[in-house]
Amino acid sequence: MEPFIVNAKTDLYAILGDPISHSMSPVIHNNAFRRFGMDKVFLAVRCDPEHVDEMMRSLRFMDLKGYVFTMPLKEMVFSHMDEVKDEAEITGAINCVQNENGRLIGHNTDSRGFWTAVASRNVKNRPINRVFILGMGGFAKAAAAQAALQGVKEIIAVNRMEETAYVDSFRAFAGRLQKKAPHSTVRLMDWDPAGWK
């Protein structure tokens, strides 16, 4: 395999967050780019959450083809999008952005990965009417959103109710979800460790 040389025509992509040094995204994406002979590079960039507004103004006009956000930026960048896809609108979080000539389109692809895993286990290809989600964090919201978009009628989310920040945030999300997918019912349940004995 010939060595890859970055040049003035190389397409640039990035993952942004803080902390970011632990991210495996550059390794995964750059290996895929090399394997398929693509003239693309994927970088990890640390972005201080206190400067997210300045970062988004800059990213809009930079020639990055797309970027990925990790915590804690996923919810912070939402208001900077020109267009938001359904999954992202419901969850209130953006993890992927397409930059089309300065027009930012926000996606939440976490939800698609969840549903692909669920569907792969549905070997009898029966309708999935109920899902059980452990936790009420960002990924739980993405999973619930995709389940509703796929027609699931009942979504049960379980968490320790003493974790009020997660619970309050999930309740607000559930309200948005009900408006977008009125056929789905979201139930929140307490996961009390005392009940495990």
Language model features: what each stretch is:
Residues 179-197:
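Short acidic low-complexity segments
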Residues 62, 92, 126, 150, ...:
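Structured loop/turn residues at beta-strand edges in well-structured enzyme cores
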Residues 24-34, 138, 142, 146, ...:
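Short, solvent-exposed amphipathic alpha-helices that sit
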Residues 17, 106-111, 118-122, 127-152, ...:
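Glycine-rich adenosine-cofactor-binding loop
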Residues 12, 41, 130, 153-155:
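Residues at the starts of beta-strands that form the adenosine-phosphate
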